[in-house]
Amino acid sequence: MNDEVERRDGPMAAPVVMPEGMAIRYDMPDPRLAVFVTGYTAYSAESREPQIDWFLPAPVMLGVALDAGPIHPRIGSRTFPPMVQASLIGPTSRPFSVTTHGGTMVGIGISAAGWAAMTGRSAVDYHNRIVPLDTVLDPSVVDRLITALTAAPDRAALRPVLDEILLPLFVRQDPHESEIRALMSLVVRPGMSEVGELAAELGITASTLRRLSQRYFGMPSKLLLRRARFLRSFVQLFVSGNPTDVTAIDPSYHDMPHFLRDANTFLGTTPRRFMQLANPFLTASVRARAAVLGAPTQALHAPPVNRD
């Protein structure tokens, strides 16, 4: 099955071919949501046989299961109860895996600015956690979301449904809005790897940066920078298929052992072993996301320069 995606220039923006009975789709949100929502995705599998899928560490994701069997999630080595129909997957610094039994999972990526506009809660409380979505959002909104997505005739109809429901949600005004948006851009900037440099760019102290990072990004600023640096490097290895290509890793890594220590933190294993675990959804999503949304993984998503 070949899921068509809007092509963008770049080595990762390649045609996405899925095995028979599986499909993947990415969509950009309404431009008014662009700073809050990093993108929409839908993964579908017809078979009801158990399937294990692995995904890279990422910012907050809202997930809604449609016509799905039991979904058993794990973050790193921690297992969670079966996911309810609508869940919030908090910001992660460990790999996320799920054992599914067919159906569709609709994902809504939430940026740090989106988190600040959606809720007054601290994102660090959800670090490496999965909770029912109605414990964070108004249950009536969650019910409406589930009902509308269930009624959508096909995957192409998901975007307008999501836009309509999500637009009214991001209304909270946060006093740190400008710092959050600046931090979103700086974290994913190639070459940015030091907390001191990041704080200086923002014009704030390292302690203030740490508090902002924990509250809105869900983890300390040092860990946030390490995650972005590691994923920039790992994605290059993943796409090339060569897990030992030292020329692909970020130059701020002292050597390959330094990179492998980060791999153990963010993948729980070596790049080679994780790549052997890669399933069709992860392999396709790296290219499909780059083609449609401009970045191969949510944690490297650059925010829009201007807000309409």
Features from the language model and the residues they span:
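Basic, alpha-helical helix-turn-helix
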Residues: 210, 214, 218-229, 260, ...
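Alpha-helical bundle regulatory/interaction domains
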Residues: 1-181, 186-206, 219-220, 235-238, ...
